[in-house]
Amino acid sequence: MRKSEFNAKSCFLMIGICVFNLNSSSCIIKTNAEHCSKRLFSFCYLGVGVIKKPLHLGNRKNMLFLSFLLVCLCEEVQMLNLTTTEVSATEFASIASKNMETNVSTSSDYLTGKSETTFSANPETWGKNVTEISIASVAYLNQSSMVTSTLAVGTTNRSSGNNVNVTTSSFPTVKGDEAQDIETFFTVILASTLSDVSEKTPQGLPTKSTPKKTVQALWETDTVQVPELTDTNEGDEEYFKDFLSSLVIWICGISFVGAFIIVIVILYNWYKKDKQRSLLWDEENKPDVQIRRDAKTCR
């Protein structure tokens, strides 16, 4: 690879990393979609250094550059799958109906990003024959400088009992080592019932009973305290283990892909040389070549 080409790729790499770090370190972000679009733009800009010039797979620097870009893109795709559009606290406050007779408890693993929520619906409130409830749960940090995230939507069946477990796959990002207060809200977006619940419906909900009736309501959990990550040795150890396991998986994956490409290149070169050898052998064994060789021998 020419020196000028290497310098151009190095410049694109450094500029892309700088833009990526600036976007990642921004504290006040309106929506997760905007945040992800900025990060993807950074990686597209970073990839110009690869697309602009033709790459030679045999060059180790190019292979390292491609591996780095592949890991970054995979991380971005994973982040896009975990984030959705957030709902602000003011929107929830405008539709809040806080007289729901429910008890909500939340247990969250802030290192793995998973949260499990259990709520007990009072039979006198909801009726005994409510068959299905869909829940959209949202958690946000109570500081405007923190990044927010919308949790996943869970569907559950209450036909077997009143306790309902909801497991979500993402949680707001906690920046810094200080303890933060997180307020979590759960919105009932769909409740189907087959019985008359006109006398058992909480205040603010529809009072008419119809088959497969849809109701909307919201209730608020207590504020939960996020532990200080640096003070939890066990949590730090688990985080370190997860980091090591992810690192090993990435290294093994990149090594496998690299080895596969190397094998393909070796087989292609072997096939190319064998074909050239075969053509040379056929050329030497042609009748006119053999006659000229015999004539030279007779002289």
UniProtKB/Swiss-Prot annotation:
Keyword NAD: no
Location in or out of the cell: Host membrane
Transmembrane feature ranges: 247-267
UniProt GO cellular component terms: host cell membrane; membrane
Membrane topology, as annotated: Single-pass membrane protein
Keyword set, alphabetical order: Host membrane, Membrane, Signal, Transmembrane, Transmembrane helix
UniProt signal peptide: 1-27
Keyword Transferase listed: no
Protein name stated in the entry: Protein U23
Native source species: Human herpesvirus 6B (strain Z29)
Organism lineage: Viruses, Duplodnaviria, Heunggongvirae, Peploviricota, Herviviricetes
Gene this protein is translated from: U23
